[in-house]
Amino acid sequence: MAQQVETARYEVPRWGKSQSCHFEPFGEQGGMMVVETEKTNEEKQRLWEFVTLDTSLYQLRSDLIPLPDKLTFFDSKSSPHWAVFLFLNEKQQRSDSVVFWAVTYNRSVEEYSTFTGRLPERSILQSMALIDGTLMLSVNNKGGGGFLSQYDLNHQRQRTITPNIGNDFILFQFEAMPASKEFVLAAREFVDKHYKATRFFVYSHDGRVVQSHRFENGENAGLGRMCFAFDTLHRLTVYATLERESNRKVTVEGMTADFSKEVVGVTWIRFAAEGTQAKTYLFKNLPDIDRALTSSDRLRVKEELLKMQQGKKKEKGEITFQFYAPRLVDFAGHHVFVAEAFQPIYHTETRMDYGYYGIYRSYPVTYTVFDGYDFFSEILLTFDDDGELLWHTSVRFENALCDRLWAHAYEAVAHDELLVASPGEHTLRYEVFDADGVQLLNQQVMPMDFMYGTDSYDDEYDAGLYRWYGNSFLVHGCQRVQNPKLRNTRRTVFYVQKIQYE
């Protein structure tokens, strides 16, 4: 069961809605919290606080680093010797080139340094990855095409890498593979503005191409979000969602941030010297997949089955999901592909309009209002080394509607068990599975402790969870807490809290 660690909670006051706060874990060496403060220096630069914490979430060190005002935190990555925190100026004009600032932390000598970079006009910084002292940024040009910007942190050198793709393309996903010290890039290839194929490149840590592959799209279907792995023979294996594609021409702007595509299945791909192997599993062919559906979709599936039994329909319709970024977990010698399903929720409102002067006969005007995203289910599919689907299951957490997309759940292996957990409303909900996909525990709900005994929960935003080290996890988010015993009876804080699974 999950157990809390007494007093292992760290809080930072939240002073504004746009304030940034982020925690970068360093494993058994603790971690670092980066907080945007209200303070500025004489040059009107914003002061960011970098707080070093140990594994008990005790503060070891605090440093204030000035950066230009109105920056937003983009992302951070860490390796055994380095940590990099990237910031962007999102208030710049659309015609301006993209300027970023990076704060690097040399963990070996505990020293900070900063550098700034300028990307081409109207380009889009997609993602960042770090292996040892090599930082890579993947950048898309607004009209198509892209490049990798490589930074050698040890020798302060930079160079640009452009993938060798003949047709139009965009960089879709880019990830670091720390075990092999390589980077994997997936780029979408377009012919006459139609998504035709996905190109895969494996780069060494110094930027050399060591593998290059191409996967052609099927009829009306293409690869969506994906995860990467290498088998024992160092062959690239891809676990990807399968998205339905129309024959209409597309625009590449904003495509990497588009999560609205309907996913109809999952595709397993292995690139080998003897040829490419691929296996596709459609959701409509998976037994018991209806448990992962919303109530309205379950009703639709039951009606279809009834029509098929009555001979009124010959073929089962597609079962589709919208997925947030999938994840891959190594469990019992197999790979578990996990994706969170969500749907946007709307409601309609009607008001009466009486014309400009209010003298005409009234008439109703109906419009749609966006309520938020509902993360209603998490789907797990387990594959062996040859791409055979061993088992699948789903987990449902009752989540409040949210106004943006972020990961609501997390999966990890602890004590030879697969733990699926999700924080929410100052509780931790979790389920446990064995290597055969058998549920060992029904969904458990564990209340979490506060900083003080007289604290009480008021509200929560952006709650998340991730693996820290060993069997320890970190719950993080933003909370509004009440305490009648304190001078300020209500406080809003960013927090991190340690949880152990025993």
For the regions a protein language model found, what residue spans apply to each?
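Post-signal peptide N-terminal segment of secreted/secretory-pathway proteins
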Residues: 17-147
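Conserved blade-ending motifs and adjacent loop-strand segments that build the rim/top face
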Residues: 213-225, 277-320, 393-410, 437-470
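Short beta-strand elements that form the blades of beta-propeller/WD-repeat-like
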Residues: 24, 28-43, 80-94, 131-142, ...
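Beta-propeller blade signature
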Residues: 47-55, 98-108, 148-154, 196-209, ...
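Repeated scaffold domains used in trafficking and secretory/extracellular systems
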Residues: 15-25, 67-78, 117-130, 167-177, ...
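Start-of-domain marker
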Residues: 3-70, 255-262, 280-318
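Solenoidal tandem-repeat scaffolds enriched in leucines and small polar residues
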Residues: 126-240
